[in-house]
């Protein structure tokens, strides 16, 4: 992680994580 979320719970609600078939995990919505 490039930063530490002060409101980590809210970050989890905001971000959408998807695990791709090849094993990668991408997160969209909460990147800075």
UniProtKB/Swiss-Prot annotation:
Location in or out of the cell: Cytoplasm, Cytoskeleton
Function statement: Actins are highly conserved proteins that are involved in various types of cell motility and are ubiquitously expressed in all eukaryotic cells. Essential component of cell cytoskeleton; plays an important role in cytoplasmic streaming, cell shape determination, cell division, organelle movement and extension growth.
GO MF terms held by the record: ATP binding
Name assigned to this protein: Actin-2
Lineage of origin: Eukaryota, Viridiplantae, Streptophyta, Embryophyta, Tracheophyta
Principal location: cytoplasm
GO annotation, cellular component aspect: cytoplasm; cytoskeleton
Natural source organism: Pseudotsuga menziesii (Douglas-fir)
Keyword annotations: ATP-binding, Cytoplasm, Cytoskeleton, Nucleotide-binding
Homology family: Belongs to the actin family.
């Amino acid at each position: 992680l490039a930063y530490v979320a002060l409101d980590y719970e809210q970050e989890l609600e905001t971000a959408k994580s998807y695990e791709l078939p090849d094993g990668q995990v991408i997160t969209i919505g909460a990147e800075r």
